[in-house]
């Protein structure tokens, strides 16, 4: 967030004033920001045609990398990432990084998890923009989900881990908080997952349908606090939005989930992202000499903020 104290002598339109202060802004970006309640004049949402005067206060809830886009460094996108990735494990073959909630793994923006990883590798002297191979994501996480992501540093690692993840050899365990206590407290959920491409969501159905894929999720209740439950969840299959949709299908959606969750509770608790963390990765046995040292290793992300709050009964 940026706070501006208006100092202009003559009354000036709000949009013109902001474009003078931040040349990277344009009418399209300003209108989008206003629709999303990201511009407040003296604490209130006001039309962009409103005249601002000396002494007025403007609050902008717009990312700094958008406001400062005119200061962008020439070159590849990773040079403009907001900082290096948080590294959990680094070896000659792979990088395991901890993704914060709200950061996309990749995409058109400069500041993505992959670009932060490339920036880290460049700072370590392991990657340059003209290298033949560019390190690559081996799997993905939803933007609102935090936790561990594997990045291949070599073509051989990329091929091996893409195959191992596709064949479900890499075990993935998550931590999450649900709105509602699941019954029974420990269970394995089955069914089929069906995508609704028009709405950008998935749903769980009991019977096989055209286009539906089998889905299996195992959960274990760690603790409960009021209306909430802290769970450890293992993905047996690995489908789009699997945990989010599966828990919602039994009446216990992930807290903070805007697609499948209880938005009244999300607003009450002021949660912006789903309380879901890719907490643990366990490697399979590798026969390849260059990867044998990784066999059976387990890696953990730091426990998310809500973990201890549920244990202590502060979040309920």
Predicted feature locations:
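Long C-terminal interaction/binding lobes of large macromolecular proteins
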Residues: 219
């Amino acid at each position: 967030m940026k706070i501006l104290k208006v100092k202009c002598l003559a009354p000036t339109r709000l949009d013109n004033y902001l474009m003078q202060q931040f040349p990277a802004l344009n009418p399209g970006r300003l209108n989008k920001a206003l629709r999303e309640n990201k511009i407040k004049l003296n604490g209130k949402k006001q039309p962009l045609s409103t005249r601002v005067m000396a002494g007025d206060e403007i609050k902008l809830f717009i990312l700094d990398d958008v406001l400062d886009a005119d200061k962008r460094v020439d070159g590849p996108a990773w040079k403009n990432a907001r900082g290096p990735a948080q590294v959990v494990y680094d070896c000659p073959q792979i990088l395991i990084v901890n993704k914060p909630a709200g950061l996309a793994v990749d995409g058109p923006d400069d500041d993505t998890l992959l670009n932060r990883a490339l920036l880290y590798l460049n700072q370590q002297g392991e990657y340059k923009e003209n290298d033949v191979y560019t390190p690559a994501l081996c799997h993905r996480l939803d933007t609102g989900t935090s936790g561990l992501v594997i990045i291949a540093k070599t073509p051989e690692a990329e091929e091996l881990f893409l195959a191992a993840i596709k064949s479900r050899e890499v075990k993935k365990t998550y931590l999450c908080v649900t709105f509602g206590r699941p019954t029974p407290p420990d269970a394995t959920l089955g069914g089929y997952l069906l995508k609704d491409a028009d709405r950008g969501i998935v749903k769980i159905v009991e019977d096989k349908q055209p286009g539906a894929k089998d889905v299996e999720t195992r959960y274990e209740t760690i603790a409960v606090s009021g209306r909430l439950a802290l769970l450890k969840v293992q993905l047996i299959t690995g489908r789009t939005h699997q945990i989010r949709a599966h828990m919602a299908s039994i009446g216990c959606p992930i807290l903070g989930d805007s697609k499948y969750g209880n938005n009244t509770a999300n607003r009450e608790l002021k949660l912006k992202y789903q309380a879901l963390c890719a907490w643990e990765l366990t490697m399979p046995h590798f026969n390849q000499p260059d990867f044998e040292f990784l066999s059976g290793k387990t890696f953990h992300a730091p426990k998310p903020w809500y973990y201890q709050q549920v244990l202590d009964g502060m979040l309920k």
